[in-house]
Amino acid sequence: MRYSALLVGMTWLLLASPPPLGAHEHATGVVKERMEMMQQVAKHWKSIRERIDAKRDLESIKADAEAIAAHAPHIAHLFPKGSTQKPSEARAAIWQNWPDFERKAAALETESKKLANADPNDFDALSAEARAVTQACVACHEKYRSKRRKETR
């Protein structure tokens, strides 16, 4: 259980932490589009985590999970080959392992839909589905996202 809590906590920090100051201002084109989309996903995920951590307003998790699921099918389209110009955090491994990347993006959609359909009155089931969404995010970010450099904010 401690491992699960640690994994969820680390993922929450990974997803909810804001980008370095000015990161989006230098992004253009598809890189900017995907950074903005990922920022929206992080916003919805933060809302979900706050509700689960507080064990309140759990029925409203559905809308945030549906929003994440709606973004997920667009992930692969926002990573055309060669779109690595800074401030992109995309690794070349995405295009070297394209089928795996697509599967991981699809897993986010699948797990987000399961979370949206989870019974808000069954906290254990809801938490389990939230962990599955966390694992979908981590699986992709660990392999395909460069680590952020610590910058002054």
Predicted regions and their residues:
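Extracytoplasmic c-type cytochrome modules immediately beyond a signal peptide or single-pass transmembrane anchor
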Residues: 24-134, 152-153
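A short hydrophobic/aromatic micro-motif that marks alpha-helical segments and, especially, helix-coil
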Residues: 17, 112-113, 137-138
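Short Cys/His-rich "knuckle" micro-motifs
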Residues: 148-149
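The canonical Cys-X-X-Cys-His
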Residues: 133-144
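N-terminal secretory signal peptides that target proteins for export/translocation
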Residues: 1-2
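Selective for proline/serine-rich intrinsically disordered segments
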Residues: 16-18, 78
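Boundary of Sec targeting at the N-terminus
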Residues: 17, 23-24
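Bacterial N-terminal signal peptides
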Residues: 5-16
